[in-house]
């Protein structure tokens, strides 16, 4: 067990609550010690919804354990009386799992009808956020999905959208807009916004859409096996993947339409998918060929995240923006094999699989790519390294839970991603220009002395100033070589001054390459001459 700080995935409780908090009429009771209700604060801070999270805690105290009593039955009664949920999900925390309590027996003593209770007693030490969320949603589908007649006209279920999902509402809106353009109705969206009654009517749809590898795919596979419902698992990230996604959707829907004697759906003009209905649905195809974006073909990108977004973004960056992929990885080991298959031919080396952010930061520092697409962790790491970074998946912070329409799915999503790539890379150039033209008043002086007027100190005379200046310039310490921030090599002042003229977003890479060059020729100190030789040797 590792200390749970800066982990990519949350606990099993976090995954369970993502599903239950997404649904209507579903409440969660955690059998846990005081303090595990931090999850409630997480939702109220990050989730941009007016509803309060449907989460309660059955507190376990030392005195209760000593007396052999449990608060769980009483807590379940209070939840039933106050919230009147259709279903209450009961789950243990890591602490209470050690007690080996029979939660089914405790729940039975609550007096709440058993059909309104569900004990989801997984092992919180072995199961993390995404696996717990996917497992619970699949169990709910198995419990409530009921065989029934299909809808008269083509309809689909959209599965896997959960609370605290990355750009959740915008992605869902993007998919629904595409479906409306095609004339396909949405039967159920679950778990987001769904109810127990909605889960019951899942088999009425013609097709299931499960774009997330992490949550929803197993539920779609169960519905396909039990109710012969075809499923679409492709990820509509990027212009061409979205076109293929629409083609596959129509192919599956029309196959069922022919069997049911319904007229097939024709592919509408691409303009119909645009926001105004008059222009191309995405500006990426022409924007990627502009002079402004042409330079991106030489830029290197590193991508790290969950399975769905890592695969989608790697393909988008290389296929549609022409960037070079210097590496990619994931913190979800259970999906690594699927990712290797999807990214075959895209990566220069092996897929990185780790849940240690330090390992990812080390790779970024070694590669020093022009762009990193990752999580909130990589954003922190890249800030220290002065490497441009854009967040593409959880874990995220408040700035990635937006009120506005910023999808990653569909044609509109392709535009959003392209904009973010462009801005993330170009802002570095802007900062360098501000540094470069600092004398024009575009930056603040870092070590500006306090005002003489404000401090009440009289200005020194020119003679005194000149003496101080002369003594400073004569001091041997003033021109002494300064050690590198990394502590490996020593740089002279003139070499350091020349290095500062290099744009900040490649400065660390230039420093590292110069030091490697100096070691190679046996120079312990980097002077201006050594710096120039390194520049010539490296093709600068």
From Swiss-Prot:
It comes from the Bacteria. Gene3D superfamilies: 1.20.89.20, Nitrogenase molybdenum iron protein domain, Proto-chlorophyllide reductase 57 kD subunit B. It catalyses: chlorophyllide a + oxidized 2[4Fe-4S]-[ferredoxin] + 2 ADP + 2 phosphate = protochlorophyllide a + reduced 2[4Fe-4S]-[ferredoxin] + 2 ATP + 2 H2O. InterPro entries: ChlB/BchB/BchZ, LI-POR_suB-like_C, Nase/OxRdtase_comp1, P-CP_red_C, Protochl_reductB, Protochlorophyllide_Rdtase. Residues 457-481 have a biased composition (Low complexity). Its cofactor is [4Fe-4S] cluster. The active site is at 292 (proton donor). The keyword Methyltransferase does not apply. Pathway: Porphyrin-containing compound metabolism; bacteriochlorophyll biosynthesis (light-independent). Binds 1 [4Fe-4S] cluster per heterodimer. The cluster is bound at the heterodimer interface by residues from both subunits. Keywords: 4Fe-4S, ATP-binding, Bacteriochlorophyll biosynthesis, Chlorophyll biosynthesis, Iron, Iron-sulfur, Metal-binding, Nucleotide-binding, Oxidoreductase, Photosynthesis. Substrate binds at residues 428-429. GO terms for molecular function: 4 iron, 4 sulfur cluster binding; ATP binding; metal ion binding; oxidoreductase activity, acting on iron-sulfur proteins as donors; oxidoreductase activity, acting on the CH-CH group of donors, iron-sulfur protein as acceptor. Residues 451-490 are annotated as: Disordered. Its EC number is 1.3.7.7. It holds the Pfam family Oxidored_nitro. [4Fe-4S] cluster binds at residue 36. GO terms for biological process: light-independent bacteriochlorophyll biosynthetic process; photosynthesis, dark reaction. NCBIfam families: DPOR_BchB, PRK02910.1-3. Belongs to the ChlB/BchB/BchZ family. Component of the dark-operative protochlorophyllide reductase (DPOR) that uses Mg-ATP and reduced ferredoxin to reduce ring D of protochlorophyllide (Pchlide) to form chlorophyllide a (Chlide). This reaction is light-independent. The NB-protein (BchN-BchB) is the catalytic component of the complex. This is Light-independent protochlorophyllide reductase subunit B. It comes from Chlorobium chlorochromatii (strain CaD3). The gene is bchB.
């Amino acid at each position: 067990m590792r200390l749970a700080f800066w982990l990519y995935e949350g606990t099993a409780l976090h995954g369970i609550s993502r599903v239950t908090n997404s649904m209507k009429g579903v409440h969660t009771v955690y059998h846990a010690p005081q303090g595990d209700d931090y999850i409630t604060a997480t939702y109220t801070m990050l989730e941009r919804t007016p509803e309060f999270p449907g989460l309660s805690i059955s507190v376990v105290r030392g005195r209760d354990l000593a007396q052999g009593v449990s608060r769980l039955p009483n807590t379940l009664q209070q939840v039933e009386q106050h919230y009147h949920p259709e279903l209450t999900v009961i789950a243990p925390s890591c602490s209470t799992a050690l007690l080996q309590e029979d939660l089914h027996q405790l729940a039975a003593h609550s007096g709440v009808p058993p059909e309104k209770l569900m004990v989801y007693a997984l092992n919180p030490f072995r199961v993390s956020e995404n696996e717990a969320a996917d497992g619970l949603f699949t169990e709910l589908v198995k419990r409530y999905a009921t065989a029934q007649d299909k809808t008269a006209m083509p309809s689909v279920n959209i599965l896997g959208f959960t609370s605290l999902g990355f750009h959740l509402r915008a992605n869902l809106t993007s998919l629904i807009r595409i479906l409306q353009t095609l004339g396909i109705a949405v039967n159920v969206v679950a778990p987001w916004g769904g109810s127990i009654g909605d889960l019951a009517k899942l088999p009425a749809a013609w097709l299931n859409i499960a774009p997330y590898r992490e949550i929803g795919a197993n539920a779609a596979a169960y519905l396909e096996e039990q109710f012969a419902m075809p499923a679409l698992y492709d990820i509509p990230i990027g212009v061409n993947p979205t076109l293929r996604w629409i083609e596959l959707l129509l192919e599956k829907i029309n196959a069922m339409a022919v069997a049911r004697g319904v007229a097939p759906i024709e592919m509408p003009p691409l303009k119909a998918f645009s926001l105004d209905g008059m222009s191309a649905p995405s500006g990426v195809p022409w924007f990627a060929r502009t002079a402004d974006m042409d330079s991106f073909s030489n830029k290197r990108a590193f991508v790290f995240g969950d399975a769905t977004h890592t695969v989608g973004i790697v393909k988008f960056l290389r296929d549609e923006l022409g960037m070079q992929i210097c590496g990619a990885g994931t913190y979800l080991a259970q999906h690594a094999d699927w990712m290797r298959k999807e990214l075959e031919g895209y990566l220069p080396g092996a897929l990185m699989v780790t849940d240690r952010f330090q390992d990812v930061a080390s790779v970024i520092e070694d590669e020093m790519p022009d762009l990193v697409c990752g999580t909130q962790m990589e954003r922190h790491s890249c800030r220290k390294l002065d490497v441009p970074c854009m967040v593409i998946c959880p874990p995220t912070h408040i700035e990635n839970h937006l009120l506005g329409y910023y999808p990653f799915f569909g044609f509109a999503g392709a535009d959003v991603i392209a904009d973010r790539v462009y801005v993330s890379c170009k802002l570095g150039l802007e900062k360098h220009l501000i540094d470069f033209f600092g004398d024009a008043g575009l930056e603040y002086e870092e070590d500006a002395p306090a005002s003489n007027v404000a401090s009440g100190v009289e200005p020194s005379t020119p003679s005194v100033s000149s003496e101080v200046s002369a003594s400073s310039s004569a001091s041997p310490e003033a021109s002494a070589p300064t050690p590198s921030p990394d502590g490996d090599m020593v740089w002279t002042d003139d070499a350091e001054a020349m290095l500062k003229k290099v744009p900040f977003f490649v400065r660390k890479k230039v420093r590292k390459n110069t030091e490697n060059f100096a070691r190679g020729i046996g120079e312990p100190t980097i002077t201006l001459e050594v710096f120039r030789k390194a520049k010539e040797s490296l093709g600068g």
